[in-house]
């Protein structure tokens, strides 16, 4: 679960991290009043969406008068911001962050993730702030410095100092960076985060460090013990189909294609999308119904897939290991009958009770295309979309 920048900075303040004074506003009038509270300009106004690339899309602007703040708010509030990280529809803008502008001398990067390889929280710091860290990692990996947090002893000040020295900081900046490092690490661990980024972490003209931007991602599996973070959730930033799927413990990710995919198992789901693409098709989604697929969950999965107007065919690919294929067949038959599917449905069953499942599908009398192989199923669903 992602948080907005203004929410991240509210948490930063509680953990002693320096950030510009700012206010999240929902109306143009509030935005003007926020500027008055902050004091003399210039100010920075930022659209609050769960996506990067806001600046290039016009969602971040430095302004020197309150009329420009009002104009920015009137232009964006209630609209959608499209960036390279959103889909073509963009993300809705419901808040504008107004904050004091900062005189920047240099931009740095500081972030942390859970490294599954080392099973540690790993901090990353770089002198290449203000750009995507993925790009830095690909082109100049030597510019990324890391510090792994030992889960038994927790973050240590010496780790912050080591990173500060590697970034070329000196004097009071080392102490400031160490304080930011310790505060951010404590925030990460206490709040069950999966990702945190300060990009950029800037050195001001006065030589001080300031967290100019903030991105936090919470571990969804730990939200049950983070009630405050749960209250910060913004459903408007989430795909409605993905939210519906989460209620049924279905793993769903919307894509841009026209072939709906329903599969059990994440690996098989990715392989299914690959083979659809290989044969000239385009997946409309990733959907993993998991090992506990029931008739009810299969029905909901069909509803979610078909709620996407782009879907022209559905590919069901089930390997029966834990789950029995005949029970999946019952679920498919019930779902097709209940939902009223009016697009071709190609089903490939393999494994536990696959023959019985295939017989049930054949005897159902419904417009379901049975496939006996993965390659054949992919070819059939692509042909169905093309009307062949």
From Swiss-Prot:
**Reactions this protein catalyses:** succinate + ATP + CoA = succinyl-CoA + ADP + phosphate; GTP + succinate + CoA = succinyl-CoA + GDP + phosphate
GO CC, alphabetical: cytosol; succinate-CoA ligase complex
Q: In this entry, which stretches build a coiled coil? A: none
The record's keywords, sorted A to Z, are:
ATP-binding, Ligase, Magnesium, Metal-binding, Nucleotide-binding, Tricarboxylic acid cycle
Name the needed cofactors: Mg(2+)
Domain named ATP-grasp: which ranges?
A: 9-244
Residues binding ATP are 46, 53-55, 99, 102, 107
- Please give the subunit comment from the record: Heterotetramer of two alpha and two beta subunits.
Name the family.
Answer: Belongs to the succinate/malate CoA ligase beta subunit family.
Q: What is this protein called?
A: Succinate--CoA ligase [ADP-forming] subunit beta
């Amino acid at each position: 679960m992602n948080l907005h920048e203004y929410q991240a900075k509210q948490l930063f303040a509680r953990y002693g991290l320096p950030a510009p004074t700012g206010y999240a506003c929902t109306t143009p009038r509030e935005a003007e009043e926020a500027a008055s509270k902050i004091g003399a300009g210039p100010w920075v106004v930022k659209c609050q969406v769960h996506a990067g690339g806001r600046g290039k899309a016009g969602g971040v602007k430095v302004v020197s008068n309150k009329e420009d703040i009002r104009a920015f708010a009137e232009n964006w509030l209630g609209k959608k911001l499209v960036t390279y990280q959103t889909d073509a529809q963009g993300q809705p803008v419901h808040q504008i962050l107004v904050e004091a502008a900062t005189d920047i001398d240099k931009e740095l990067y500081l972030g942390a993730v859970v490294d599954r390889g080392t099973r540690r929280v790993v901090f990353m710091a770089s002198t290449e702030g203000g750009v995507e860290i993925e790009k830095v990692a690909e082109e100049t990996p030597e510019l990324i410095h890391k510090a792994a947090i030992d889960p038994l002893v927790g973050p240590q000040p010496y780790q912050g100092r080591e990173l500060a020295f590697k970034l070329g900081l000196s004097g009071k900046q080392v102490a400031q960076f160490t304080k930011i490092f310790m505060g951010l690490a404590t925030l990460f661990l206490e709040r069950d985060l999966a990702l945190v980024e300060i990009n950029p972490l800037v050195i001001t003209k006065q030589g001080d460090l300031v967290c100019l931007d903030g991105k936090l991602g919470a571990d969804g599996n730990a939200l049950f013990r983070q009630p405050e973070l749960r209250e910060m959730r913004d459903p408007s930033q989430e795909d409605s189909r993905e939210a519906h799927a989460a209620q049924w413990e279905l793993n769903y990710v919307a894509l841009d294609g026209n072939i709906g995919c329903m599969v059990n198992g994440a690996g098989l789901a990715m392989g299914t999308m690959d083979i659809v693409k290989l044969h000239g098709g385009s997946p409309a989604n990733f959907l993993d119904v998991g090992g506990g697929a029931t008739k009810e969950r299969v029905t909901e999965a069909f509803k979610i897939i078909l709620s996407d107007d782009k879907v022209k065919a559905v590919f069901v690919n089930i390997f029966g290991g834990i789950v029995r294929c005949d029970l999946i067949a019952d679920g498919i038959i019930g779902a097709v009958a209940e939902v009223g599917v009016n697009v071709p449905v190609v089903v490939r069953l393999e494994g536990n009770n696959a023959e019985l499942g295939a017989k049930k599908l054949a005897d159902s009398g419904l417009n379901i295309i049975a496939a006996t192989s993965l390659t054949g199923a992919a070819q059939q669903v692509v042909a169905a979309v093309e009307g062949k």
